[in-house]
A protein has these predicted regions:
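Acidic, Mg2+-coordinating active-site environments of NTP-dependent enzymes
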Residues: 1-4, 20, 25-104, 121, ...
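Nucleotide phosphate-binding/pyrophosphate-handling subdomain across enzymes
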Residues: 1-3, 12-24, 28-29, 42, ...
Length: 469
């Protein structure tokens, strides 16, 4: 178990562990001074309260006075002290996908941006080494995989690339300086549109000063906090500096305006706006991608749809999971979707049990197997659905394979549906089923805008190819 301290250490609610294996002290700055103390030494003493007798202590190599305090506390508690050696990780390359480095003969990648992420990685790896010394079996492949799957939302996070859209929740001058350094490192002299909101009790003037050389214009919003600086006041301050600045009534409007510029965007200034920025961005981009894919599908002629649907059905029958399946969750096509009639004929001839969805009023759907004499209804979306009075309800765990229609997909297994989330919610109830996305090749995108609630696919089957993940 890994416990992250909320604030400080000695008096934090997480500090109830009698004998931790490793206590990790990360970088310490002058934050929460009203609770933790006004100097680095005072804060270090509070942070060091998580050190217990006989544990290992991993200390981020920060200010000398901090390191000295943590070293002394480790000695008091007879705890083995490890000072993180930042040179233990050797940078190899960096781009907007993350940082690649070498450590102890391994080539590792973290999908996080900024030089300080290498320092954070070195800290984590030092903790791993300490655990190994204490007898923990942590294989190299687990280290490499764990680093590659690390996520840190709203820390110079790339939400999208067309145009580039960055999100950073930094809310103090120190964070702003790091943001400015990262902009120089990754984008050079390129100017950005800043979507900015700040809290009135933060030193926002110093924050603005750090990023000003990188700004082409500012779109000002009011974060969701009683301490927020009103967007109009922020706009007026920026205009007083000679900046191009406009105020927006809400965050969705500002995100929409930022994307319309077609220029790189950085949403920045407060964690209180990060969640709204993320959701608004995904909604905007998914709407655009959904429209593009539906238009692409609509451009197919009726003859092409029939031909491609038949070819796709043949590809589908070749999947081992489909050939070995007993229960298959399928669907009836709507509008211009892939028609699986050819596949349904094959499935029935080969003894497969087919079930079809019914959309329920509560935002969920259920699957029903038709009776010997099929009786259909037309659902609220105009799709043919089994009549539940003449069909058998199937539990999600019954299914070996679930066929999932889509609006768009990418080569990494990303999928865009119609936006209601019916399939994502159902798939979550059937964790052992093979998930197969069904689409025409014309519906392929370079990269789907994904959200945390989007369920990954095992295959995407088109008339031209089977994509495996």
């Amino acid at each position: 178990m890994v416990l992250e301290v909320g604030m400080g250490g000695a008096l934090d609610s997480t500090n109830v562990i009698d004998m931790p294996e490793v206590a990790v002290i990360t970088n310490i700055g002058l934050e929460h001074t009203e609770f933790l103390g006004n100097t680095l030494e005072e804060i270090a003493m509070t942070k060091g309260g998580i050190i217990k007798k006989g544990c290992d202590v991993v200390c981020y190599n920060s200010a000398p006075e901090v390191v000295s305090i943590i070293r002394q506390l480790s000695a008091v508690w007879d705890a083995k002290f490890h000072l993180v050696d930042f040179d233990s990780v050797t940078p190899v390359s960096h781009d907007l996908s993350g940082e690649t480095f070498e450590w102890s003969g391994l080539t590792c990648n973290v999908p996080l941006l900024g030089d300080y992420q290498l320092h954070n990685a070195a800290t984590a790896l030092t903790a791993i080494s300490a655990l190994r010394d204490r007898g923990w079996a942590i294989p190299d492949d687990a280290v490499v995989t764990g680093l590659s799957k690390t996520r840190w939302p709203a820390r110079f996070e790339v939400l999208g690339r067309e145009p580039l859209f960055l999100l950073d929740g930094g809310h103090n001058p120190q964070c702003a300086e790091v943001v400015a350094e990262n902009l120089t490192k990754y984008l050079g002299d390129e100017k950005l549109v800043f979507l900015t909101g700040v809290l009135s009790d933060k030193d926002y003037k110093a924050m603005i000063a750090s990023v000003l050389p990188h700004a082409e214009q500012f779109l000002c919003v009011t974060p969701d906090s009683p301490r927020a600086l009103d967007a109009l006041d922020l706009r007026d301050y920026l205009r007083g500096l000679g900046c191009s600045a406009d105020a927006y009534e809400d965050i969705p409007s500002a995100v929409h305006a930022a994307l319309l510029t077609g220029k790189p965007v950085l949403a920045f200034g407060s964690l209180y706006m990060a969640g709204d920025v993320r959701s608004s961005y995904y909604k905007e981009k998914k709407t655009a991608q959904r429209k593009y894919c539906m238009n692409s599908r609509r451009m197919l002629t009726p003859e092409q749809r029939i031909e491609f649907s038949a070819e796709l059905s043949k590809n589908l029958t070749k999947l081992p999971e489909v050939q070995n399946a007993t229960h298959i969750f399928s669907y009836m096509a709507m509008q211009d979707e892939v028609d699986l009639s050819v596949f349904h004929d094959w499935a029935e001839q080969n003894g497969k049990v087919l079930s079809y969805p019914i959309s329920m009023q509560n935002g969920h759907m259920e699957a029903y197997t038709l009776g010997e004499e099929p009786v259909w209804n037309y659902g609220k979306y105009g799709i043919r659905e089994p009549n539940p009075d003449f069909s058998e309800l199937r539990a999600p765990e019954d299914f070996d394979v679930i066929l999932v229609p889509c609006v768009g997909f990418d080569e990494d297994g990303g999928r865009i549906g119609h936006g209601a989330g019916y399939y994502d919610r159902y798939i979550d109830r059937a964790p052992d089923a093979c998930r197969v996305c069904i689409a025409f090749e014309a519906q392929k995108l370079e990269k789907v805008v994904e959200e945390d609630t989007d369920m990954p696919m095992d295959y995407v089957v088109t008339e031209a190819k089977v994509y495996t993940f």
